[in-house]
Amino acid sequence: MSISSKIRPTPRKPSRMATDHSFKMKNFYADPFAISSISLAIVSWVIAIGGSISSASTNESFPRFTWWGIVYQFLIICSLMLFYCFDLVDHYRIFITTSIAVAFVYNTNSATNLVYADGPKKAAASAGVILLSIINLIWILYYGGDNASPTNRWIDSFSIKGIRPSPLENSLHRARRRGNRNTTPYQNNVYNDAIRDSGYATQFDGYPQQQPSHTNYVSSTALAGFENTQPNTSEAVNLHLNTLQQRINSASNAKETNDNSNNQTNTNIGNTFDTDFSNGNTETTMGDTLGLYSDIGDDNFIYKAKALYPYDADDDDAYEISFEQNEILQVSDIEGRWWKARRANGETGIIPSNYVQLIDGPEEMHR
């Protein structure tokens, strides 16, 4: 059996976390910014519509296009409330921003026509559209910015649900991780590490030794192997292994001839790199690697981390795991940008380190 068949990862079960977009008023009540801004918008809209009706009912001339601006603003307010209740604000941010920008133009145009007109009733209507223009400008700043922007983070910090996850940061994070993925097969790493530790590396001068191109995920070389499991590299890997086997055997034979005292040691080293990987030592190492996420003991998860934001695992990566905000995770390796972790339900895999925070004691779990 070749090594490529032994390191093929077992597919992970689909994530159990599903996003609920059912109608819930608590989604609206849990956001202070939504309640305060929409409430002010409703009050301003009532002032504008009241002043407009009073002004139009008299003999005073009233700009007719203002009626459409007031109706359009009402549709925007109702749409915002529905987006919050269905928890779809992040899905329609571009639509919300552009729609509010149009309403801002309508209201500022109406304010220009009403401010310089005569009559107290028109003054009330102009005050309403001016307030709506100010609120629309604040909405454009908030909904037009990413959730990772300083203003949005400060506003969302008052929300009961906490800071919203940033789609932009998430996309950049995954793109950076894909770009830094190691292109060296796991088999090469096993051989390179063993040759370097056994002292044979100096005997093969001129023979190219590929090295891992990154250590972004975890400190162990086992995880680097999981990032490259394409079957189209198996032929090149087998050719490399056979060539390396011949070189190691040659070096081992030369070592036996020159120094009989090291005969047993060199024989063990040569047998370790069997082409079919039938040796017990190598089999044990691969078994430990395959059990990296499934059979790891409780003692290895010596850290605890609290999730700062919710995270949805990438469907293309079988070793990412999803988690909820404020969820407590057990972590076994805290080096690099990706940590090995386990959820309370036993699901194990890797998590982005910038989405969690290490905690020291039980008192920090409830903060």
Swiss-Prot record:
Which residues belong to any copy of the SH3 domain?
A: 300-361
The membrane-topology field of this record reads: Multi-pass membrane protein
Annotated S-S bridges: none
Tree of life domain: Eukaryota
Topological domain ranges for the Extracellular compartment: 54-65, 115-122
Topology check: give the Cytoplasmic ranges: 1-32, 87-93, 144-367
Per UniProt, the ranges with Low complexity bias are: 259-272
Q: Which residues carry this modification: Phosphoserine?
A: S166
Q: Where is this region: Disordered?
A: 252-276
Q: Please provide the record's keywords in A-Z order.
A: Cell membrane, Cell projection, Glycoprotein, Membrane, Phosphoprotein, SH3 domain, Stress response, Transmembrane, Transmembrane helix
Q: Which Pfam families match?
A: SH3_1
A GO biological process of this protein is: regulation of actin filament polymerization
Which SMART domains does the entry mention?
SH3
Q: Which residues are glycosylated according to the annotation?
A: N59
Keyword Membrane recorded: yes
The record's family statement is: Belongs to the SHO1 family.
- Which named protein is this? High osmolarity signaling protein SHO1
Identify the species of origin. Answer: Saccharomyces cerevisiae (strain AWRI1631)
Point out the gene that encodes the protein.
SHO1
